[in-house]
Amino acid sequence: MASISATLPSPLLLTQRKSNLTSIQKLPFSLTRGTNDLSPLSLTRNPSSISLMVKASGESSDSSTDLDVVSTIQNVWDKSEDRLGLIGLGFAGIVALWASLNLITAIDKLPVISSGFELVGILFSTWFTYRYLLFKPDRQELSKIVKKSVADILGQ
């Protein structure tokens, strides 16, 4: 469960013993004095500061997709016969990423070429959105293409 806590100085939220926290009470969570582990929001006030602690009430679905990615990588690593080749491929990928970032940085410093590449990028993004993302049958076609490419890469 995630939680966030903050301590704010008194002058930011209180003016002459009048609280500016009345708008918080209109929100759909409970506002209590003191710390209560069961409530999603706890507010405590002492003369010098206001402490606010917020806790998440549920789990996010992002953790399940992270576990799927980790399990997929573990399966590929376990099934591999040439682990040295996988390590070399990973290292080559990192070097290629580093080199391409340096190349892009060098091109970006040139005055006219970077503007031309931005125009090409905008035009390509517009075409891709119109071709694959605007209408439902085109989105389904893109989904099939991506699934086929992933299956080809993973050897399934």
Swiss-Prot record:
Asked whether the keyword rRNA processing is assigned, the reply is no
The record's principal subcellular location, in a coarse class, is: plastid
The entry summarizes the disruption phenotype as follows:
No effect on growth behavior, leaf coloration, grana stacks or photochemical efficiency of photosystem II. Curt1a, curt1b, curt1c and curt1d quadruple mutant shows disorganized thylakoids with extended stretches of unstacked membranes and broader stacks made up of fewer layers.
**What is the topology of this protein in the membrane according to its UniProt annotation?**
Multi-pass membrane protein
* Transmembrane portions of the chain: 84-104, 110-130
Coiled-coil regions listed: none
Question: Residue range of the transit peptide?
Answer: 1-55
**Residue spans, topological domain Lumenal:** 105-109
Q: Which residues lie on this side of the membrane: Stromal?
A: 56-83, 131-156
A single GO cellular-component term on record? chloroplast
Q: Where in the cell is it found?
A: Plastid, Chloroplast thylakoid membrane
Pfam families per UniProt = CAAD (PF14159)
Assembly description: Homo- and heterodimers and trimers. Interacts with PSAD2.
Chain's role? Determines thylakoid architecture by inducing membrane curvature.
Q: Which family does it belong to?
A: Belongs to the CURT family.
Return the protein name. Answer: Protein CURVATURE THYLAKOID 1C, chloroplastic
Taxonomic source organism: Arabidopsis thaliana
